[in-house]
Amino acid sequence: MAKLKSAYVCNDCGTEHGQWQGQCASCGEWNTLSKINLGPANAPSAAANFKRQGITGSLSSVTTLNDINLEDQPRIATGIGEFDRVLGEGIVPGSAVLIGGNPGAGKSTLLLQILCKLSQDIKALYVTGEESLQQVAMRAKRLDLPTNKLLMLAETNINEITNLAQEHQPKLIVIDSIQVMHSAEIASAPGSVSQVRECAAYLVQYAKQTNTAIFFVGHVTKDGNLAGPKVLEH
């Protein structure tokens, strides 16, 4: 049986340490390290495995700013003025955006409204990991949203999500929420520091390599901070 690789991860900044220590060497906080199992010692990370699966595109090519054709990257306007302004006048293809807020603040409803509208012209996928498809459909009906073209998926396995995304090739994806997603490559529970970090990295790489815009819904703690490692915010 393969030996499990373990590490101590700071709950505040997400920095890995080879052994436990009272103070995080990166952010300086005390008593924030938690032990996690990362899977077999020779197992690749989810992000590394993603690139091995043959997703088109590369993140390692070198170019100059003058060689980048901005005409091929038009922003996608949502029609919601304040939201577009926050994003710099629209959604950028290939971007990964984290939407955080208190429970009931309207994160899921806002993104559902945006995807229903944009799905009339652009292929869009809404992935729900917390609510059932019926619950999402009821909310859309209550808001009288156009749902005839929006793709829906109830799934929390990040590998299955990206496999289906490759099959249907949506240009917009909502992940609701990142805290309930998990990767089969990581031997820890959904919502743990390692799971959130790896799933986010996996999806960001997918967004960059396929030019797909992805929105993550993120929960917040009682203190008003985003739940999970600090690296999720960056």
Feature map (PLM): residue ranges:
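Short Cys/His-rich micro-motifs in 6-15 aa windows
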Residues: 28-38
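Flexible beta-alpha connector loops of hexameric P-loop NTPases
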Residues: 72-73, 148-155, 183-197, 224
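Phosphate-binding/switch region of NTP-binding enzymes
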Residues: 204-234
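The Walker A/P-loop phosphate-binding site
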Residues: 51-143, 162
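Nucleotide-state-sensitive switch-loop elements of NTP-binding domains
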Residues: 116-186
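Short cysteine-rich clusters marking metal-coordination/redox-active sites
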Residues: 10-13, 24-27
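Short metal-coordination and nucleic-acid-contact micro-motifs, chiefly zinc-binding Cys/His arrays
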Residues: 4-6, 20-23
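Catalytic, metal-anchored helix/loop core of enzyme active sites in primary metabolism
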Residues: 44, 161, 195-199, 205-215
